[in-house]
Amino acid sequence: MRKTYINGLGCISVQETFDTIFLEKAEINENDTILPVKTPVYKDFISPVAIRRMAKGVKNGIVASAMAMKEANVSTVDAIITGTGMGCIEDSEKFLKAIIDNKEEFLTPTSFIQSTHNTVGAQIALGLQCKAYNLTYVNGSISFESALLDAKMKIEEEEANIILVGGIDENADYTTSLFKLAGFIKRENEGPYKVLNATTKGAVYGEGATFFVLENEKKSTTYAEILDVEIINKLDVNEVESKCSAFLEANGLQVSDIDTIVLGFNGDVEFDPYYKILSENSFKNTPQAFYKQLSGEYNTASAFGLWVGAKIIKTQEVPEIISVNNLEKPAYKTILLYNQYKGIDHSFTLISKC
């Protein structure tokens, strides 16, 4: 069975994760409940004519994918697989608002055409003139992991050699207001909004696009090997440790073999115990990292988490800004990532140095 290597990365997020090495310009914002994306210079990647018609999620996805392909030194791919929770929600809102404002008459189709969840994958394919396998997974907070698992299986089964995989989500005003009403987002005027040891419900929300070029061959640009991905729909808090141990054992590993665990803490006091049980028990003597204090919470934030894990292996450091317990190891070879959202859609991802 062939191996799967991460050979290129591209990340557009609420931090300056482009034109940097690894979070040296990152800042923690504990005052706002919604974190806007930091945008690159779009016209360096997309023609100004096309930019006008694109929502930010589409633009960010195109730029992040271009960065990943440039780093991996590839010009075409055998498959494009994306994951998104809310899709191009900004254009969906525009179209629905136009229906109401115009009383269902004289509607322009642009926002409707651009509002589908697979718009990002389609626009990337159009730009590359790529007519290969193109699939978008819309599966809540495991949308990205579903795409990653599909890509890994295609490489293992020798159905593709080079695959572009990404996770994309964007914020939109009306949807955000609904999330606030539902209690998904932290209440205003309750800051500072700390992620670790939080005492309130909800999370600080963000947005972003993170892409990876996966190949079956190791290259000079290789970050890490993807060893395994597992998705579990529902778990009780007291089941997490046993499921984690079983996942490691299936890969011939033990807790002591993990050099860093990357956890998806988001500051929701109701559901962060899923992470705490690993942090305070099985992995209490293991270096721990967290990332949603930088990225914010969104359906495909775990793609940002994988970007963090890959960078740790490449740079052989865990920056202080993402360290949970300030423990260190002389080398970071094997990293475990764990994420969940509101107690469902749990994922374990295992990567290693090649």
Predicted regions and their residues:
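Alpha-to-beta junction loops
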Residues: 159-161
